[in-house]
Amino acid sequence: MRILITGAAGFIGRALAAQLAADDRHQVAILVRDHYRSQPLPQVLIDQKDRLLVVFADLRDYQNTARAVRAVRPDLVYHLAAGGISDPYLDVNAAIEQNLYGTLNLLRAAFEQEMDSHPRQLVAVRTPGELSAMNPYAASKAAAWQFCAMYARTRGWPISGVMPFQTYGPGQHDRHLVSGAMAAALAGEDFPMTEGSQEKDWIYIDDVVDGLIAVGEAELPPGTNVELGTGTLNSVADIVSRVYDVTGKGGGPLFGALPSRAGEVQAHAADVETARALIGWQASISLDEGLARYCNHMQDQAA
């Protein structure tokens, strides 16, 4: 199967690309921005460079995007590219251009332009932040999905949505909670944070990748949305405490050192029953096992 992945240099995208590239059944292409012509890709992609086709395009440019899609002629597209994932101050115009217009350009390039064949499925990767849309990133992602759903309903384009919940694990930037807490804990330092009362559904990166692959292999009705999570809620305070327990290096969380964000959704777990019914998938890595794996990985990287 010919597979095109946008956002393959990101946290989830690189893990997905590496796993798919290792499967001899697939020909995997990754669409990345032009600046990767002069700077290295993430190491996990370099390790698979002989099994990856790299195409360069800026999704904000329809002509370049259409050219890249024609070059690959994918059977399956995973759309993970997004701007501002960890930037709460992302400019509104930048969010709209990258996340809304970029998605629309990819959809049109995949299904509207004349080609010998069109993808049998495009998987749009969403964010649980869409449920509250507290920043331009989340709001623009929510708007992009509404257009995906509209095209699926009105034109029958085979677009599916996948919403991974709070993903953590190797490759995540330390601006995120678990990775930042893990780095501080391994250094024996304290970790300033909010009171940590928010409850979230935490899922390890390997489970997310397996779920994305299961969606890509399924025959789903256009407009279907699948949530990837464990179905279990754990508070932010509990997660950070567990991080310090698993590292055992000293230091600790400083609860209440930072203010909570107003309006944040307090609790929402993934709909795991629907995921199991639609794609035959469920998370298999417990929270304690996932944190232990992540800790071991970071220690190995530092050795």
Task: Describe the residue ranges of each PLM region.
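Substrate-positioning beta->alpha
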Residues: 139, 161, 172-183, 194-214, ...
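C-terminal "lid/loop" region of Rossmann-like NAD(P)-dependent oxidoreductases
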Residues: 30, 195, 223-226, 234-241, ...
